[in-house]
Amino acid sequence: KIDQQNEYFILVSPGDDVCLQESANMHIVTVNWPSYPLWEQIGLPLALKKIKPDLLHCTSNTAPLHCPVPLVLTLHDIIYLEKRQSSSQSWYQEMGWHYRRLVVPRILPKCKKIITVSQFERKRILEALHLQDGQLVAVYNGFNSHFHLQPKAPEITRKYIDSDNYLFFLGNTDPKKNTPRVLKAYSEYLKRSEKKLPLLIADLKEDAIDRILEEEKITDIKSSLRFPGYIANTDLAALYSGAFAFLYPSLRESFGIPMLEAMACGTPIITGNTSAMPEIAGEGALLVDPYHPEEITEKILQLENDNQFYQQQIEYGLERSKLFSWKNSAEALLKIYKGLTR
């Protein structure tokens, strides 16, 4: 929408074009290879030799080791370069970890420009990889426009939870998502709260939840948990809007799009005071030490017991989320593209 002069080719795997729309100067090209490493290292360079673009922008941390055109890379984070993944990682996640550790250090010197998603991550990357300062820039992410303040939609929320008021948490087996401490914080909340709101946990299977509850010796809270598993992206806005608060106290994030989605829907967030979360959520957000479950509990209770403070957090989130959009991101990227193709 912001550039009608240049021509763009979006290269995707089969089936990955469902959310994309072609236009006069935007073309979708399907590249068919059986696995992602082969797709990126063989299929993508072959397709580029046919298209002959002025530059390639790879948007997900890795790129072809032998790229036939000038390369721009978005490096979202370097978590996989900093530490070994935990034993809870799936086989697919483990292979992805090895692939990134192999590819990333080898392609960075070949990049004309490297983009990351926050000033926090930019600083970490510069320190860890000793890049030239001008080679690495931060361009903030945006979030989809269908996340906005809207009336409650019980016809959607009741598909996932049998309550009109609840706490909302995007669960994950990734240790950085801090699921065990969130559940410990919720256990303490149930002991101290008069309202005892249920906790809706998205995208986490019951067996994974059961393991955490048993390890933390808090199996008694299971009846207050709702775990529908996968939640369609089209339903997320309604679930944010229906939630009393959104819990996002990760141990580490390079950006944290869900925080902005919840804020834009008028839902107060509780997030971590580490990594990029204070930068994105801002100083007015409810920031906690994610390693201390009692801090998470206290913030939930503060929201519950102080309606004026609760309303202030709603207003703060609505205003804060206006600072971020994909249009802003696209304009920043276009400026980079033009600078490299003059």
PLM features per residue range, with description:
Residues 1-342:
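Carbohydrate transferase catalytic cores enriched for Leloir-type hexosyltransferases
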